[in-house]
A protein has these predicted regions:
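N-terminal Lys/Arg-rich, disordered targeting/topogenic segments
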Residues: 1-10
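Sec-dependent N-terminal signal peptides
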Residues: 9-21
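Non-catalytic, solvent-exposed segments at the cell envelope interface
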Residues: 2, 15-16, 25-355
């Protein structure tokens, strides 16, 4: 099986989490003692602008189509990683941080997920680049595409590249993980040489990326592979949030600032990390959006399994004080072999049936 053609759906999310958290640790350590104590003892106002120290992200404006009011101290974010070859986002993770409940939920969105747009290629991984190529804000383009899937605008968004992930992990000393079996694969055409022995060990940045890209030897295919990726992410998160100091911390922060396209301020990052540090490992959960593959417009797509997705959406991502319903979404799904839309309109519907 060709493991190079499709990179890990989660590998860049590792780097995003590590980079964001590292920057926050630096800020937290640099705060004057009195200011740090004040930030911990009083939750910031939900509508307050970012300030020095720590600051909760600004909540996205609640639209008329959303189901209710925002819950206090609950924030949503989009983390994405770039595919250097195609120029599109290769990894998309939508998350919810509940500061009061001390819980973080992260949902992987397949890169080929169909979005209800009039594009030639209607995949969510095109949204960031399509917006930038049109002279618009790439982050807003990605946020808008995700809105149709989720029914709300994410409060914050960050996009980075694969090389940054490798460098960040190396600067922080690697990630300890119990590799379940020997991983060996060679592909000169794609400059891949994976040789990771089984067992508990410290993986460097390159090895972390290779582990998440490896696709052989899984009895249940992608189901087992995604399970391994989630185990790895939990191990990385557990190690990271337990750290009091990190070698080369300033260099990692500099790398994050120079390499990540984000609308998060440094104070926002510090606030979100403080939320993460207060979570136990069991309170950081990873999921994959329920989906099914299908061809449309002569291309292979991933379509949302609507009912299962609504259940997961309300359990893991809903930032409101009432459930999100399908009337709040704008997604295309398959029902009885037919394409349907929750909004009642499929943009350029003839496209779906084009061979």
């Amino acid at each position: 099986m060709d493991i190079g053609s499709t990179k890990s759906k989660l590998v860049r999310a590792i780097g995003l989490l590590l980079l964001a958290g590292t920057a926050a640790l630096l800020l937290h350590g640099a705060l004057p003692r009195s200011e740090a104590a004040a930030a911990e003892s009083a939750a910031p106002e939900n509508t307050a602008p970012p300030r020095e120290g720590t600051a909760a992200p600004l909540m996205a404006e609640t639209r008329e189509s959303t189901p209710a009011q925002r819950r206090k101290s609950v924030y949503t974010l989009i983390l994405a990683g770039m595919d250097e070859v195609s120029g599109n986002t290769d990894t998309i993770v939508i998350g919810r941080v509940d500061a009061e409940a001390r819980r973080i939920d992260l949902v992987s969105i397949p890169r080929d997920t169909y979005v209800n747009r009039s594009w030639d290629v209607r995949k969510i991984n095109c949204a960031y680049t399509m917006a930038k190529n049109a002279g618009n804000d790439g982050l807003e383009g990605l946020r808008e595409a995700a809105r149709g899937l989720c029914g709300f605008d994410a409060d914050c968004c960050a996009v980075m590249d694969l090389e940054t992930v490798k460098q960040a992990i190396d600067l922080m000393g690697g990630v300890y993980f119990d590799v379940p079996f020997d991983m060996d694969y060679e592909d000169a055409a794609q400059d891949l040489s994976i040789h990771i022995p089984a067992g508990y060990q410290c993986l460097n940045g390159e090895q972390c990326v290779q582990l998440c890209r490896y696709r052989k030897n899984y009895v249940n295919g992608d189901i087992d592979r995604i399970s391994l990726q989630h185990d790895f992410l939990k191990a990385a998160a557990r190690q990271f949030i337990s750290l009091g100091s990190i070698p080369n911390l300033a260099r990692v922060v500099q790398l994050a600032v120079s390499s990540v396209d984000s609308d998060l301020t440094a104070a926002n990052i510090a606030y979100l990390l403080r939320c993460a540090i207060q979570c136990s490992a069991d309170d950081i959960a990873f999921y994959t959006m329920p989906n099914r593959p299908a061809d449309a417009g002569g291309l292979s797509y991933t379509f949302v399994e609507k009912d299962e997705w609504l259940a997961m959406l309300n359990d893991t991502l809903d930032p409101f004080d009432a459930p999100i319903g399908e009337e709040n979404l704008d997604l295309v799904y398959i029902d009885g072999g037919l394409f349907r839309s929750t909004s009642g309109t499929i943009r350029g519907e003839n496209y779906l049936y084009r061979k």
